[in-house]
Curated annotation (Swiss-Prot):
Species classification: Bacteria, Pseudomonadati, Chlorobiota, Chlorobiia, Chlorobiales
Cofactor note: Binds 2 [4Fe-4S] clusters.
Keyword annotations: 4Fe-4S, Electron transport, Iron, Iron-sulfur, Metal-binding, Repeat, Transport
Descriptive protein name: Ferredoxin-2
GO terms of molecular function: 4 iron, 4 sulfur cluster binding; metal ion binding
Domain 4Fe-4S ferredoxin-type: 2-28, 29-62
Binding residue positions for [4Fe-4S] cluster 2: C19, C38, C41, C50
Length: 62
Protein backbone atom coordinates (compact mmCIF):
# COMPACT_ATOMS: atom_id res chain seq x y z
CA UNK A 1 0.00 0.00 0.00
CA UNK A 2 1.05 3.57 -0.51
CA UNK A 3 0.26 6.90 1.07
CA UNK A 4 -1.26 10.09 -0.30
CA UNK A 5 -1.00 13.71 0.82
CA UNK A 6 -4.37 15.44 1.13
CA UNK A 7 -5.33 19.02 0.31
CA UNK A 8 -4.74 19.95 3.96
CA UNK A 9 -0.99 20.00 3.18
CA UNK A 10 0.56 23.31 4.28
CA UNK A 11 3.54 22.93 1.92
CA UNK A 12 5.96 22.88 4.87
CA UNK A 13 8.32 20.35 3.21
CA UNK A 14 8.87 18.32 6.39
CA UNK A 15 8.01 15.07 4.62
CA UNK A 16 10.14 15.28 1.48
CA UNK A 17 13.61 14.72 2.99
CA UNK A 18 12.31 11.91 5.22
CA UNK A 19 11.31 9.59 2.37
CA UNK A 20 13.94 6.85 1.98
CA UNK A 21 12.93 6.15 -1.64
CA UNK A 22 12.43 9.76 -2.80
CA UNK A 23 8.74 9.21 -3.54
CA UNK A 24 7.75 12.70 -2.34
CA UNK A 25 8.07 15.81 -4.46
CA UNK A 26 6.73 19.36 -4.49
CA UNK A 27 3.56 19.80 -6.48
CA UNK A 28 1.96 23.09 -7.46
CA UNK A 29 0.25 23.71 -4.11
CA UNK A 30 0.85 20.55 -2.04
CA UNK A 31 3.52 17.88 -1.82
CA UNK A 32 2.81 14.72 -3.80
CA UNK A 33 3.68 11.08 -3.14
CA UNK A 34 4.34 8.88 -6.18
CA UNK A 35 2.23 5.88 -5.23
CA UNK A 36 4.19 3.65 -7.61
CA UNK A 37 7.42 4.41 -5.73
CA UNK A 38 6.19 4.59 -2.11
CA UNK A 39 7.03 1.47 -0.10
CA UNK A 40 5.42 2.59 3.19
CA UNK A 41 8.97 2.69 4.60
CA UNK A 42 8.93 -1.10 4.90
CA UNK A 43 12.50 -2.17 5.54
CA UNK A 44 13.50 1.39 6.46
CA UNK A 45 11.40 2.52 9.45
CA UNK A 46 8.88 1.07 11.90
CA UNK A 47 6.24 3.49 10.59
CA UNK A 48 6.01 5.67 7.48
CA UNK A 49 8.49 8.50 8.08
CA UNK A 50 6.38 11.09 6.28
CA UNK A 51 3.40 10.37 8.52
CA UNK A 52 5.58 10.64 11.62
CA UNK A 53 6.86 14.13 10.74
CA UNK A 54 3.75 15.73 9.20
CA UNK A 55 2.67 18.56 11.51
CA UNK A 56 -0.92 18.62 10.20
CA UNK A 57 -1.54 14.86 9.80
CA UNK A 58 -2.49 15.17 6.14
CA UNK A 59 -0.83 11.97 4.90
CA UNK A 60 -3.20 9.03 4.58
CA UNK A 61 -2.92 5.41 3.51
CA UNK A 62 -4.33 4.74 0.04
Amino acid sequence: MAHRITDECTYCAACEPECPVSAISAGDSIYVIDENVCVDCIGYHDEPACVAVCPVDCIIKV
